[in-house]
Amino acid sequence: MSRRYFGTDGIRGRANGLITPELAMKVGQAAGLVFQRGEYRHRVVIGKDTRLSGYMIETALVAGFTSVGMDVLLLGPMPTPAVAMLTKSMRADLGVMISASHNLFEDNGIKLFGPLGFKLSDDVEKQIEQLLDESLDKKLAESASLGRARRIDGVHDRYIEFAKRTLPRDLSLDGLRVVIDCAHGAAYKVVPEALWELGADVIAIGVEPDGFNINKECGSTAPEALSRKVREMRADIGIALDGDADRVILVDERGHVVDGDQLLAVIAQSWKEDGRLSKPGIVATVMSNLGLERFLQSNGIEMVRTPVGDRYVLEQMLKQGYNVGGEPSGHIILSDYATTGDGFVAALQVLAVVQKLGRPVSEVCHLFEPLPQVLKNVRYRAGKPLEDDEVKSAIHAAEKRLNGHGRLLVRSSGTEPVIRVMGEGDDREMVEEVVDTICSALGEAAAAAA
C-alpha cells in the first residue's frame, strides 16, 4: 500500500491545507485504536512547538484520542526528544509531537512515538494509514469509556534534569559564555535554564515565540544571527536549535558554523578515546561529507551510510549495535541517552569535550577539511520531475563526469515537494557545473508539469 499521509518524519504539510482539524482528529482516533492493547486505561502524551496552528491541531487530536477511550496528558511546548523521553517515562502507550521541525510557521506536522519512545515503524504507520481511509464511527468508545485530558505541570524540570544527567556530575560549564538560539521554538524555556543550571554564562536569543516567528531567520537553518551575536558578545560558543530542538548546529568563537558532520567527528573521536563507543564505528547518511568518512577511517572508526532521514540512521544503529549516528543537518542520535535526535544533548557532549580540553571551540570542532559540496533544492508543484527523460539524461551525464572524482545524490524530500541535488568532489568548479545542469533540467521539467 502506498503511503498517502506519512513521510520520512511523520505527517507534515500546510496547516489547514493537508493538516486540517478533521485529519488531526482522525489521526488521533486511528492511532488510538492501533495502540489500545490490554485491559487497562490507555494514555497518550502530546507535546507541541510554538506554531499558531498547534492549538488547533492539539485540540483536534485530543478529540480524536478521547473519542476512542484514550486519556491524554498535555505537555505544552516541549522539544521533540523530551516528548519521546516522557512517553517512556510516563508509561504512555503513545507519544505525539505537533511540529513541522525546521519549517516556517505556515506548516505543521504530527510525529508519533511508540511506548518506548521510538518513532513508529513503517508497518505501524501503514496500519494507521489504513484506518485513516475508513469510517471509524462504529469503533468509537461508549459514553462511559471516553478518555479524559489534563495538562501536566513540571515537565520542563523533568527534561532539564534528564539533559543534565548526560554529563558527569563533576563537570561544570563555569567560565563558558554560551549564546543559545532556540529558534523561537519548543526549547525556548528549557534549554537556557538547563545551561544556566550547569554554570554557563547564558545569552539567549530566539526565545520570544509569537506563533509566527518560529525558524524565521534564526535557529539551525539560519545561523547567521547567532554568528553575529557570538562575535558581538565575544562568546565562547553558539548553539542553534531548530523549532522542535531535534537538530543542532554550533558556531565557534569566530562566528564560523560547525555542522552535523563536524559534531559527529568530535563526539566519535572523544567517545572512542574514552571507550564509550559501543563498537568502533558510527552511522551517517549519504549526505555526510566524504571528508568526515576519511577522517574517521584515519582514526580507526568505521562509517556506515544510510538513506537520508534520522529514522534510517537509528534503524541501522539498533540493527548493528552502534551508539552514535547523525546527519549534516544536525540530527545527532546518541542512543545511550535518547531514542531520537536530541540537539541539546548533542551540544552538551561537545561542550564537555571543550571543557575537558580547555581549548577554543575553533580548534576542538574543526577536525577535518570538508570536500567541496554543493547542495541545491528545486521546488515543484506537480508531476514527478525525476521521471522526466531529460532529467534522467542530465543525471547520467553528471555521474559519468564525476566518476572517480566525487559523488552525486539526487533525491526527493520526504517532507516537502522539493528535489535535492547534492554534488561533492575535489574540484568545486566541476561539481557546481554538474549540479547546475541537473537543477536546470529539473526546473524545466517542473515548469512543464505545473
Swiss-Prot record:
Its EC number is 5.4.2.10. Binds 1 Mg(2+) ion per subunit. Coiled coil: none annotated. It catalyses: alpha-D-glucosamine 1-phosphate = D-glucosamine 6-phosphate. Keywords: Isomerase, Magnesium, Metal-binding, Phosphoprotein. Belongs to the phosphohexose mutase family. This is Phosphoglucosamine mutase.
